[in-house]
Amino acid sequence: MSESILSATLGYVELETGSIPADWVLSGNPQTRSKILGRSGDLLAHAILWECGAVSYKWHYNQDEAYIVLSGEGFMTDEKGVERRFGPGDVAFFPAGTNATWRHPDHFRKVAVLKESVWRPVGVGLKVWKKLFRVIGITDTSPLLLAVTTWTAWKLR
């Protein structure tokens, strides 16, 4: 099965207007612009282009987020009160559940990959399951094949 490959010239992506939740805004203009660039086949992750203007706000990461800054700068203060600067070329990762305070003096533009977190035993089980399929030589595991294999294994127990 062929999957679609993400390819975008970021300067030509039409962004949609959004905003930072009003009760999270500390100062400035909470308007944002973003566009989902692509989603994973399991719908647990997506890539997004996101930007904002001069603003300061609190942020709660309800998904894992990894990103690279394209332009502008942001100053993030973590829960321990430590401030870090992020500028063009910088890469960051914020696990789900992280809280931070952000300040953008002018503008900030990033490409981010957001991923839903799953309960650790489920994630480990999935990795073991996929490894088992690779070991026995099954590399293209369709949902139908997985369902039939699971049903068969259940009936044979």
Model-derived features: positions:
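A short, N-terminal "cap"/entry segment at the start of jelly-roll beta-barrel domains
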Residues: M1-L43, L144-R157
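Glycine- and acidic-residue-biased ligand/ion/polar-headgroup-sensing regions
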Residues: A54-V55, N62-E79
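Short acidic-glycine-tyrosine-enriched beta hairpin
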Residues: K80-A96
